[in-house]
Amino acid sequence: MGSTLLLKDAQNETYFKSWYQKLLAALQFCSGKALSDEFSKEKKLIKILGDIGEKVKSASDPQRQEVLKKEIGRLEEFFQCIKTCHLPLNPALCIKGIDRDACSYFTSHALPLKITFINANPMGKNISIIFKAGDDLRQDMLVLQIIQVMDNIWLQEGLDMQMIIYRCLSTGKGQGLVQMVPDAITLAKIHRHSGLIGPLKENTIKKWFSQHNHLKADYEKVCLAAANFK
C-alpha cells in the first residue's frame, strides 16, 4: 500500500514522472482485483485521516478537540461501510473500527493525530498510530531502515542494544503514519523528573533506569545495552 501511495505522489516529480507512472502501472496490473480493492480501502482511509488532520490544524486551539471528535465520525462511517481494512503501516494487522475515546492530537507544531483503531482480531489489543502532516517522513523511513540494518549487524557480533525499531510509512508528500511505541518515555520527560539541572547530571538516566527496573537482571540488561553504545 505504501509503495502505491508514494508512486502516485511521485508522478508529480518533474524528471522521473514517466518512470514512476510505468512502475505504478506494472504494480496495479499484477495486483489483481482483491488486492486492488484493499488498496482502494487503505487509500480512502489515508484520505480521511489527511482531511481530519487539516481540519484540526485549521481550527482554533479551544475548538480542536471538539473538531477532532466530530471528524472521528467520518472514520466510524468508513468502517461501517467497509467492515474491515488492513493497516497501511503494517499489512499483517487488520482493523475494524475506531476507539473514539482514545483518539487525540499532540500539541507540537505539526499537531499530529493520535488515532486508535480497534483490532479485527478479538484476541488482539487496540492499535494506536500517529498521523503526521507537514513532515517529510521519507527521511525517517530511510534512517529507520539503516538502524534496522545496523541492529542486525550488532546482533550478529553479539552486541544487543535492546533496540525497539518502530514502523514509519510515508503516504505522500509531507504526510505519513508512525507506530506508537507502548509505554515509551522521552529523554526530556526523564530529565524533567530530575529538576532544573537534570540534563547536566551524568547519572540522571542511570538513576531513572534503576528506579524503573527493580529486578537486578532487568537493570543489568539495560546497563549492558547502554554500555554497548559507547
Give residue ranges: language-model regions:
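Conserved ATP-binding subdomain of kinase catalytic cores across diverse folds
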Residues: G73-F229
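Cytosolic small-GTPase signaling regions in large eukaryotic proteins
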Residues: M1-Y105, H109-P112, F117
